[in-house]
């Protein structure tokens, strides 16, 4: 793995830079913020992540090791490739991403071009527990999120599947009234599955009630 590059900056473009390493030019993709810190002809250093594909090797560069760490974690989300992960870092700094993932703030991710509610919900769901804020940002989360940090994540996942926030919240509460042990465990995936099961059973009960009236 290429952990970082340090060399003379040969070129800075709109979405990438070229670092001269002893006569070899290494092309590195980066965010506008990272590129703005580089000056042609001067020494530059970028932390890097190498993406290996069957037909290509692509370097992505970052101004800090923290940015690279968040980038690599974002890549663990199904459907999120390196370009989209880089776009997230172009809109939010690493700490803001950590806070959004930790508090289940799916709306923060929809501010990124190319990310709609469905993908944002998936990001929040799959990053649960993987990104924890370093600073005080988590303290600014709503009190409800502090007492039940899993709840915004489950709500975001359900809204991405088509439910309104009000219906999602109500369904979660009703499902957990049948399975209180899940609330104590606070596992996002398990609570989401239990809520979806409850919705299916409630739909079946509603169908039975309609059938009995007919």
UniProtKB/Swiss-Prot annotation:
Name the record gives this protein: Holliday junction branch migration complex subunit RuvA
Annotated spans, Domain III: 153-214
Oligomer and partners: Homotetramer. Forms an RuvA(8)-RuvB(12)-Holliday junction (HJ) complex. HJ DNA is sandwiched between 2 RuvA tetramers; dsDNA enters through RuvA and exits via RuvB. An RuvB hexamer assembles on each DNA strand where it exits the tetramer. Each RuvB hexamer is contacted by two RuvA subunits (via domain III) on 2 adjacent RuvB subunits; this complex drives branch migration. In the full resolvosome a probable DNA-RuvA(4)-RuvB(12)-RuvC(2) complex forms which resolves the HJ.
Taxonomic classification: Bacteria, Bacillati, Actinomycetota, Actinomycetes, Micrococcales
Protein task: The RuvA-RuvB-RuvC complex processes Holliday junction (HJ) DNA during genetic recombination and DNA repair, while the RuvA-RuvB complex plays an important role in the rescue of blocked DNA replication forks via replication fork reversal (RFR). RuvA specifically binds to HJ cruciform DNA, conferring on it an open structure. The RuvB hexamer acts as an ATP-dependent pump, pulling dsDNA into and through the RuvAB complex. HJ branch migration allows RuvC to scan DNA until it finds its consensus sequence, where it cleaves and resolves the cruciform DNA.
Organism this protein belongs to: Arthrobacter sp. (strain FB24)
Annotated InterPro entries: DNA_helicase_Holl-junc_RuvA_I, Hlx-hairpin-Hlx_DNA-bd_motif, NA-bd_OB-fold, RuvA, RuvA_2-like, RuvA_C, RuvA_C_sf
Pfam family, one: HHH_5
Keywords (A to Z) from UniProt: Cytoplasm, DNA damage, DNA recombination, DNA repair, DNA-binding
Region called Domain II, residue ranges: 64-142
């Amino acid at each position: 793995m290429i952990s970082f590059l340090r060399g003379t900056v040969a070129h800075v473009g709109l979405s990438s830079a070229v670092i001269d390493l002893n006569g070899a030019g290494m092309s590195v993709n980066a965010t506008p913020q990272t590129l703005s810190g580089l000056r042609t002809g001067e020494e530059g250093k970028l932390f890097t992540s190498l993406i290996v594909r069957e037909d290509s090797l692509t370097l992505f560069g970052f101004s800090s090791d923290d940015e690279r760490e968040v980038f690599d974690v974002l890549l663990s989300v199904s459907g999120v490739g390196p370009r989209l992960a880089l776009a997230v870092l172009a809109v939010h700094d690493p700490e803001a991403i950590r806070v959004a993932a930790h508090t289940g703030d799916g709306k923060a991710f929809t501010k990124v071009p190319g990310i709609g509610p469905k993908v944002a919900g998936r990001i929040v769901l799959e990053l649960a527990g993987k990104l924890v804020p370093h600073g005080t940002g988590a303290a600014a989360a709503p009190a409800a999120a502090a007492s039940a940090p899993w709840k915004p994540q489950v709500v975001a996942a359900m809204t991405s599947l088509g439910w309104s926030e009000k219906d999602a919240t109500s369904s979660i509460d009703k499902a957990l009234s049948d399975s209180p042990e899940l609330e104590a465990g606070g596992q996002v995936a398990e609570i989401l599955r239990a809520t979806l099961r409850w919705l299916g059973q409630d739909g079946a009960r509603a169908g039975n009630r309609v059938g009995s009236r007919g």
